[in-house]
Structure formats: structure tokens, C-alpha cells
Amino acid sequence: AEGVGLAANQVGVDLKVFVFDCPDADDQRVTGVVCNPVLRLPEGDARQLDVHDEGCLSLPGAFTECARPDLSWVSGLDEAGQPVEFAGTGLLARCLQHETDHLYGTVFGDRVPEKARKKLYKAHEKLADGYPADWPVTESDFE
């Protein structure tokens, strides 16, 4: 797929697992697999919101501004069942939050004001026919 992260339930797999390949705020590429993620966010004065356009492979081509904390940590297990923890800044912080949300039934459109959400879904409807029916993972991903 063409995104920075993908949750298992986005491709019909009923497991609490996500994968990511995403740069952090310093443009350092970070990759990983997280099973049964537990997300931590800064609190109090340490909590700073970052407002940027966000998209989703479940809503291909549609983007809207979404406010999220600029730092996040996720812990869980890797693909071998070993404990793992990732600290995210910049886009990586957003990715860790976004993918964990998917696994707990929240899509990023749920995190934006109603007016923005309506525009997001309308934009997606206009673009949806341009994507294969098996999006976000297509047969070509396995060739």
C-alpha cells in the first residue's frame, strides 16, 4: 500500500496488529510491527497539539486537517512476540496514533469537527471509483 501505516482490520484481518514505515520529525525512517498496541500521549504542559492534513488508506485521496499530540509512544509485541516500544515525533507520532485508533474502532474522521468530516467523506466519494476494489492492498502488492 502507499501509506505510512496499515492496520490489520483495514484489510479484513481481525487482529490488533499494525505495520508502519514512516519518517519522524527528524526525517529518520522508522519501521515496525506492533501487536496489541498500548498508546501513551503527553499530558498537561507537555501536551502540544500539531494540526496537519491527515489521510487514510481507507479513504483514499481524501485529506483534512486533524489535531493530534506532537509526541506519542506505543508499546506492544513485535511479530516474534517480543516486547517493543516506539517513540514518535512529527509524522511518526501521528502515524502511531492513527494506526492504534483503527484497531480500537476509531477512524481519523471521527477526530475532526462535523463540517470537516462531511467534506472529507464527500471528497472520498468523488475519488473512490479511481481506486481498485481491493484497496488498500491490491494483488500487485504481492507480485
Task: Label the model's feature ranges.
Residues 1-143:
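Positively charged
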